[in-house]
Every structure is written in C-alpha cells, then in structure tokens.
From Swiss-Prot:
Listed name of the protein: Large ribosomal subunit protein uL2
Keywords noted in UniProt: Ribonucleoprotein, Ribosomal protein, RNA-binding, rRNA-binding
Function recorded in the entry: One of the primary rRNA binding proteins. Required for association of the 30S and 50S subunits to form the 70S ribosome, for tRNA binding and peptide bond formation. It has been suggested to have peptidyltransferase activity; this is somewhat controversial. Makes several contacts with the 16S rRNA in the 70S ribosome.
Subunit structure: Part of the 50S ribosomal subunit. Forms a bridge to the 30S subunit in the 70S ribosome.
Gene: rpl2
Length: 238
C-alpha cells in the first residue's frame, strides 16, 4: 500500500478537491465597456451565487447589453443606473475616477484602465477617493492603504451590499460544513497530533507527547515538512 500523503502535499497537487468551483458562478462580474458619454441601464434582478460573497445585480442596458455587477447598498430591482462621464453621481453609476468628486465612496475599482474592476469587490467594502493629482488619483482602500491609480480608471459609486455577512454565526457544524462544501474548502481542520501515525509525523497514540520536534529544517523532504519550518526561534520572545 502506498503512503498517505500529507494535506499540504495533496493541496499542492491542485486536484479538483482543492480548486475553487468557478463553474458555479452566475457569470463574469466586470465593468462593461460602452461607447458614448451616457448609457442608461435598468436593474432587472438581484441574485446570489456560491462563488461571490456579495449579492449581484443584473443590469440590462439600453443598447441591449447585459452585465453582472456587485449590488450596492440601497439598490433595488427596477432602479436605473448610469454609465459614462456624464453619468450622475448616484448609487450604482459607473464613471472614470477623474469625474467622481473627492470624498465619494466607490467600489469595483480598475487597477488599470479597461481591466473591468479588480479592487474592492467583497461584500460591505468601499474605497474613498481622497485626492486628484492631474492624471492620477489617490484612493484609500478598505485596508487603510493609500493607492495611486490612473484618472482614466473606472469605478462604481456606492458601498457593496452584504456588509453584515460575518455577524451571523454558523451556530451548528452542519452549517459550516455546507458552507465549506460550496466553496471546496477543506473543513474541518484537524490537529496533526490527533491524527494517526500514518497520516501525520506528529500522529499516533504510542506516546503521550509528540515523538518528533515541531521545528524542521527547510531542506526536509515534503512528507516531513510540517510544524515550524526553518524557524530561527520558537516560543515567546524574552
């Protein structure tokens, strides 16, 4: 019989067990690109899938296109959203950063103009437009970090809905199990000392304490590299 590989070895192989199930997504969530300074759209649906933490809004534009975007707080089905330089400064409007007033809460920021929005996409998140400096704009991200972006990069005005998601506890292990299964998360996480000797270097019941030191060389083979890898020191600092 073959040896049972460690969890870190199995995860590193990248089997479907550990991959994000992107095929369960409702669609591609990105800022669309249209010609013209003002394009109107209508929110036709609010949906939720197992991939994105934030609720999504389905927008039907007047040119016939349809897009999927994180829903801002306060939006509802039937509301009108706008796209372009001449769009009003209303919730859900998509505008270049150069056309958005300073101090506005925004989300779905483009890291590079035209990339569709790569920053600030999680539920409850928003960034602040702090200052405009010619062709550059300074924004404050949810982490507190200040980032300089191109003034031609686009963003959506508002705060992403679903900010209280973490306030509701799982309560039962079954709820946590189904949540983890929907995202291919490995759960529950078991301590190596509690495992069998064949499953982990620290496992087994022959000794009351672990039979190997927690510190391990960074040159150790993959099946042994668990614990404090290449640690210079352990424990509390004096």
């Amino acid at each position: 019989m073959g040896k049972v590989r460690l969890l870190v070895q199995r995860r590193g192989r990248g089997s479907p067990t550990f991959r994000s199930p992107t095929h369960r997504a409702a669609g591609k969530v990105k800022i669309p690109t249209f010609d013209g300074d003002l394009v109107k759209g209508k929110v036709v649906a609010l949906i939720k899938d197992s991939i994105h933490y934030a609720p999504l809004m389905v927008v039907k534009w007047e040119n016939g296109a349809q897009s999927l975007l994180p829903a801002p707080l306060g939006i509802s089905v039937g509301d009108t959203v706008y796209y372009g330089k001449e769009a009003p400064n209303a919730i859900g409007s998509i505008k270049p950063l150069s056309e958005i007033p300073e101090g506005t809460k925004i989300y779905m920021l483009e890291n590079n103009p035209g990339d569709g929005g790569k920053l600030v996409r999680a539920s409850g998140d928003f960034a602040l437009l702090v200052q405009k400096l010619g062709d550059k704009v300074i924004v404050q991200l949810p982490s507190g970090q200040f980032k300089t972006l191109s003034a031609n990069a686009r963003a959506v005005i508002g705060v992403i809905a679903g900010g209280g998601r973490k306030e509701k506890p799982f309560v039962k292990a079954g709820n946590k199990y189904y949540w983890a299964s929907s995202r291919n998360r490995h759960w529950p996480v078991v301590n190596g000392v509690k495992k069998n000797a064949s499953d982990h270097p620290f496992g087994g019941k022959r000794h009351s304490n672990h039979s190997k030191p927690f510190t391990v060389s960074k040159w150790a083979p993959p099946g042994r590299k668990v614990g404090y890898i290449g640690a210079r020191k352990t424990g509390r600092g004096k």
